[in-house]
């Protein structure tokens, strides 16, 4: 496998979930690649969603996502017109155009199986099988959607473990302690270390972050200006961002309320989280369920803290945030199904706090402290999406995650602040807490608000 790019913490895709929408779509598209040379022999495909993918798959659109993927389409390539046409063919005409080349019959009730039992390797798993006319299996593969849109086969997961032992990447780091030592050794910021690492891998950090930033802006614009009154699904949740935007345009907050800026932070976060919930184009940061925290904190900095924030500074914020996200992916989890919402909103808040601290001229140590504080106060946060939808409590959690990130950054910048807990320690604690958490509270919609709220 190619060396992991820290830049991939941010991915352009579609809502409402990175693990349950982007991941299954990629699995379907990758499975098409395995059918080269035997595609014309395929008469039927069978999809089995396991664990959290089965329990919340319909609300998270996992079923639709894998069907789109089986047409050979990835999330960053999908447009709404194509999506509607493919799903109409699958659900109404009962036909799939496998790999966008070969038509096969499709029966949703028989060919798409929801198995609530998780596989041993991860809570988010799906098995894809292709059969010939004799009902013999031509090809079979198991995929694990481990959070943040990252998808691996069994073999790839094994290789990930081996890479950690065998592969050497310039300017790489496995812990916050190693990252701090790198920054001190080379007299570089976290963002500069990430640039050096990604350039060594022949990637394009600044061009990529600029593209990511503009995708975030587009998502905000679409959410803030949506003409839809309600989000999709049975909950009939009202899209509030457009009305908040209209109110703030007509009656900008005055200096009388020292906390008035919270309204703007809420607008930024709500716009993006609501657009994600509607299945729109979004950026994983590090997941779809937590996609609004990082960009809303960045918008707060750009629109209210700094005049004329340069594109380089914006990229620095994103690269710093990505480095923090990388530490969680490497040493813990980005999956609500594996570690609860602390692995999504908690990680996003930690990332945003570090990025903002960097913009505020923090030392590397202070950046890491800010990230630690933000996660420390998300520990134990459950993932209990009501109705299997990424709406309640997800949208408002993005707002509060952004506010916590800003508060954490300010705390870390106090000169006399002497932390007792390191970022590495809080990452380990988050993962251990997630492993101990009851499965009802890990993206199954079997406990918490999902159980209490009748919908």
Swiss-Prot record:
The UniProt record lists the keyword Lyase: yes
InterPro entries registered for this protein in UniProt: ASB_dom_sf (IPR029009), Fe-S_L-Ser (IPR051318), Fe-S_L-Ser_mono (IPR004644), Ser_deHydtase-like_asu (IPR005130), Ser_deHydtase_bsu (IPR005131)
Reaction(s) this enzyme catalyzes, per UniProt: L-serine = pyruvate + NH4(+)
UniProt cross-references to Pfam families, sorted A to Z: SDH_alpha, SDH_beta
EC number: 4.3.1.17
Pathway(s): Carbohydrate biosynthesis; gluconeogenesis
Cofactor: binding details: Binds 1 [4Fe-4S] cluster.
GO BP term, example: gluconeogenesis
Single GO MF annotation: L-serine ammonia-lyase activity
Protein keywords: 4Fe-4S, Gluconeogenesis, Iron, Iron-sulfur, Lyase, Metal-binding
Cofactor(s) required for function per UniProt: [4Fe-4S] cluster
NCBIfam families cross-referenced by the UniProt entry: sda_mono
Family: Belongs to the iron-sulfur dependent L-serine dehydratase family.
Protein name from the UniProt record: L-serine dehydratase
Naturally occurring in which organism (per UniProt): Helicobacter pylori (strain J99 / ATCC 700824) (Campylobacter pylori J99)
